[in-house]
């Protein structure tokens, strides 16, 4: 592993670069040419580069870049088929009694507020079909890792595996089950014990677009995520 501009490079070959993005760093610029982003740091290291997928600013963890347009398109156009695993670790508010679970809902992003809204899996709802045609199906597997307390308040460490990759999916699904991610005030959190969003992209596995190899990457969960 190497560090360039404080961005840890997990893997690099002739086509791909996989980095470990810190929390608080945008993936790409919002329009400011001199804005510090994961993209600008990788560009300074490798030159022309293409981002394959994104993480929220406050989410840390594994992020994939392509070194050429063909590789980017090869991955993006077949992303759902190529990806074998997308695993996240999070600290949720409250005590979750279940050891594992499965969340299926429909998600919709409000174009004005940019908030993602959830529908399904409550009494009276019909998750088999969306309330409107512009809602997207989202499915998440979850597994309880540890239950504990911080300053007398209950928290639960949970691993999430994405079956679909919707915007803010884990954040919205956590709010939906009544246990927002610690530090996620946008989606209902009341506490911020770590001074950041307690969400980390810790595992990623996909089929390499050119070699056909199964690529598996892991990022250590931040040490501060302790309860």
Annotate the PLM regions.
Residues 1-227:
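RNA pseudouridine synthases
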